[in-house]
Swiss-Prot record:
It comes from Escherichia coli O9:H4 (strain HS). InterPro entries: MFS (IPR011701), MFS_dom (IPR020846), MFS_MdtG_subfamily (IPR050497), MFS_trans_sf (IPR036259), Mutidrug-R_MdtG (IPR023692), Tet-R_TetA/multi-R_MdtG-like (IPR001958). GO terms for biological process: response to antibiotic. SUPFAM superfamilies: MFS general substrate transporter. This is Multidrug resistance protein MdtG. The lineage of its organism: Bacteria, Pseudomonadati, Pseudomonadota, Gammaproteobacteria, Enterobacterales. Its main location: membrane.
Amino acid sequence: MSPCENDTPINWKRNLIVAWLGCFLTGAAFSLVMPFLPLYVEQLGVTGHSALNMWSGIVFSITFLFSAIASPFWGGLADRKGRKLMLLRSALGMGIVMVLMGLAQNIWQFLILRALLGLLGGFVPNANALIATQVPRNKSGWALGTLSTGGVSGALLGPMAGGLLADSYGLRPVFFITASVLILCFFVTLFCIREKFQPVSKKEMLHMREVVTSLKNPKLVLSLFVTTLIIQVATGSIAPILTLYVRELAGNVSNVAFISGMIASVPGVAALLLSAPRLGKLGDRIGPEKILITALIFSVLLLIPMSYVQTPLQLGILRFLLGAADGALLPAVQTLLVYNSSNQIAGRIFSYNQSFRDIGNVTGPLMGAAISANYGFRAVFLVTAGVVLFNAVYSWNSLRRRRIPQVSN
């Protein structure tokens, strides 16, 4: 039992602050190594342009693939043993794997460790489940929106810090620094997260069919999972072509990498500063379903003109506005999941949602790369807009016959 745990009532606001810090640290830890991942693959002995591209894509995607496979298992274990235990397992497990990555001697070892990283992940969905089961229902949107800014902040700062550290100390030491960040996250969680959880035996656990029947609206929950997948597909489809598209727009400039980095970062800045907590709080007042549909439509209206921009500045402005819309989407989905499931199955519901998110992280870049190879960069934005429009119609159809029940503390 940690020093913070006693018989006093749980302070969910303090847990939210500590969970936010944990999501920030894990978000930073994951993104610290991303700027130089292809360079590390090359250092491990992969040579040749095509081979380097192939292996870089594989080692990047395999983490999300194995995370999608493992998330439901960890979600079920969280519902049996408690969410705090899963947070500790995730932080410590990923920390150990990061150390081993820094010691990898060939590409196959690194590939296996990237897969293991996906298997042992799950800090963010379990943090979402923990806060969702403790926060008053009428504050769910604000709390989950605030929590989402932790991971976004870490993911924004991580690449910059990782690039500086790699330039200063080399590639391998960054993995050890990342491991230290994750171990710090482990101890912060151990000593300052509080959870009163009564373990449930395996026999008492609800089976899959019982989980589905316990949902207030199973079809709606499935549509929310699909929405999460499409959000990530839309985000990931642009990632592979963004730098090349910026270079096409900018022409012959020497700082195309810097410009691309800025344009890649502005959606996260917008989500952090403008939308996630504020629109989450608004969703608590007017209903998260209204926020979800409005943000999806707004995203479509911003993606279409991205295909016709003529300068990097125009693209940057549109991506900033898109970030403001995107920052409201996942918190709205998560709030609707809270409204439509019980605390007893929260771990599994959030883990299933994470699985769909990971599948989107894998398929989005593949879709974007395939479209750009066959039809050009600008077509990626139009196809992505069509996918998001389909999701808006699908979500509206799923939501229009339901009415959010009145919730109270």
